[in-house]
Amino acid sequence: MAEEEHVSAVESGPLADQYRLSLENRIIHAWLKPPSARLGIDCRVEVTQVPGGEVVGARVTQCNGDASVRQSIENAVYRASPLPEPPDPALFHRTFVFEFKPQ
């Protein structure tokens, strides 16, 4: 039970927020914006990684951008590999979904 409480506390705490932000920033900085990209892009991306952060899968599941934008986002995830390691092992998830909203 203590293990579950630790995982729950870590996943809802500031370390989790910091880790999510580092993942999102790494991917957004790897993004090569296609000519068809417009302001207000909002996409959900499913990422699969292995321990060590190597990306083995990336798929845009929902997006208000066209096919070119979707493909560019998936490519950015692969370019961002390896992803940053979490500050606590409890934060590692083989598959996670994040919201891609570049400014």
What residue ranges belong to the model's regions?
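Compositionally biased, low-complexity segments enriched in charged/polar and small residues
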Residues: 1-71, 75-79, 86-95, 100-103
